[in-house]
């Protein structure tokens, strides 16, 4: 957009500097694992505690590389679900999700707020000691559902509005 033409893109270190004490930043990696050595330098130079930084990616190889090269920070695999039109089956199944999380040594799952996420899904993940984060939750009823399920966090486009609707302060 023209009104932002002269704006400078902040560096990752500059973004890290905006994270308040006790809060977390989710760093989504959109490319492949070739970025991890540079990310490692940025993370190691950050004035944040390791527990404040969480890497997320749809690319399982990125998560595996982060867990190997930067084991001090959490890395969550991102996934969404597709339905087979012929069988009606959804994939990945919870079994496939857990197998992938184990294979790549992920710290947890960050997934879309799908109807598949139910008590059994959460129990299966918790049984394996994985975190669960959901996106994009912009409606109070959906937020209440995922809060009741006990997810670790939700991602929303309307944080202030949603907190007010849920009477969270």
Name the predicted role of every residue range.
Residues 2-9, 85-169:
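C-terminal active-site rim and adjoining tail of enzyme catalytic domains
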């Amino acid at each position: 957009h023209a009104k932002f033409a002269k704006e400078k893109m902040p560096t990752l270190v500059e973004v890290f500097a905006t994270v308040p004490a006790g809060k977390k930043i989710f760093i989504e990696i959109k490319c492949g694992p070739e970025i991890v050595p540079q990310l490692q330098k940025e993370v190691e130079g950050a004035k944040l505690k390791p527990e404040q930084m969480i890497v997320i990616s749809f690319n399982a190889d990125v998560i595996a590389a982060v867990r190997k090269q930067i084991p001090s920070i959490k890395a969550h695999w991102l996934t969404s679900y597709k339905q087979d039109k012929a069988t009606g089956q959804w994939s990945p199944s919870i079994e496939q999700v857990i197998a992938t999380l184990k294979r790549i040594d992920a710290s947890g799952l960050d997934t879309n707020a799908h109807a598949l996420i139910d008590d059994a899904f959460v129990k299966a993940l918790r049984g394996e000691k994985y975190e669960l984060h959901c996106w994009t939750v912009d409606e109070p009823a959906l937020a209440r559902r995922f809060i009741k399920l006990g997810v670790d966090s939700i991602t929303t486009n309307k944080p202030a509005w949603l907190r007010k609707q849920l009477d969270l302060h």
